[in-house]
Regions:
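A residue-level signal for conserved active-site and pocket-lining positions in enzyme catalytic cores
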Residues: 10, 29, 68, 96, ...
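A short beta-strand-loop micro-motif that forms or neighbors metal/cofactor-
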Residues: 107-120
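Helix-hairpin-helix
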Residues: 68, 85-107, 128
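Helicase P-loop NTPase motor core
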Residues: 1-50, 73-78, 109, 132, ...
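Well-ordered alpha-helical segments embedded in enzymatic catalytic cores
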Residues: 6-13, 67, 188, 231
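Accessory C-terminal helicase-associated subdomains
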Residues: 15, 19, 23, 35, ...
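Conserved short internal alpha-helix adjacent to the catalytic or cofactor-binding core
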Residues: 45-49, 57-92
């Protein structure tokens, strides 16, 4: 009886409750930890049951999950500008706003992706030494993550990227109150990747397919306040 079985059992009870003529709004799902919301949210979306999360964010809206997905996207596609911007200085590696502004302007002027613009600026040697070293370190990190995760299973790829990027270590060493919950969320993301059922018919490699799935999950709107929804 795993977490998915548990969530399916709860969903079956909710649907039976609804079939008996009761309202979804009379149902609340309580979970033991923040990370457990992921499997419930996934099943609710899959079955078209409206829901709303109270007292927190939905799984794929959490900052640490967005950071992790950005790393996975950038490893899969170097020209993903939103992902580049999100994690080029997460965890902090000395890439300041001025360097990022220079990078954006260079990319726009040359019609390049941020990844291409970064290589271009480094080859032109126009950046200050500290900024250049930080930028090169980030580019090298992404290339290393791609090389180290090549040939691994889907779950192992996610685990490798989360460890290799320093995200897991950063949150484990963080002293803020929510650090443990963030680590649990990242570990749950690895579980989500590991358990993802890839459909080769979609024409995508397994990781790209999972990332498309995650984008759909994140894009699903929560139920409106007036809707009859599970909470």
């Amino acid at each position: 009886f795993n977490e998915t079985d548990e969530a399916r059992f709860v969903l079956d009870r909710i649907q039976a409750w609804e079939t008996a003529g009761h309202k979804r709004a009379e149902v609340a799902i309580l979970y033991r930890s923040n990370a457990q919301s992921r499997v419930f949210e996934e099943l609710l979306v899959q079955t078209g049951v409206p829901y709303r999360v109270y007292g927190g964010l939905r799984f794929f809206e959490r900052a640490e999950i967005k950071d992790a997905l950005a790393y996975l996207r950038l490893v899969a596609s170097r020209h993903d500008d939103p992902s580049f911007e999100r994690v080029c200085n997460v965890p902090t590696r000395g890439l300041g706003d001025r360097t990022l502004d220079t990078l954006r302007l260079h990319a726009r002027a040359k019609g390049l992706s941020l990844w291409e613009a970064a290589h271009s600026l480094l080859s032109e040697q126009t950046l200050a030494a500290r900024a250049a070293n930080a930028l090169k370190g980030f580019l090298d990190l992404i290339e290393r993550l791609a090389a180290d995760s090549a040939g691994l299973s889907l779950g192992e790829q996610a685990e490798q990227v989360l460890h290799g990027s320093g995200l897991l270590e950063f949150h484990r060493n963080d002293k803020i109150e929510k650090s443990d919950a963030r680590v649990e969320n990242l570990e749950e993301l690895v579980n989500a990747v590991r358990n993802y059922e890839h459909d080769p018919a979609r024409g995508l490699d397994p990781m790209s397919s999972f990332l498309a799935h995650a984008a759909r999950e994140a894009g699903e709107a929560e139920a409106e306040a007036w809707e009859d929804r599970v909470q």
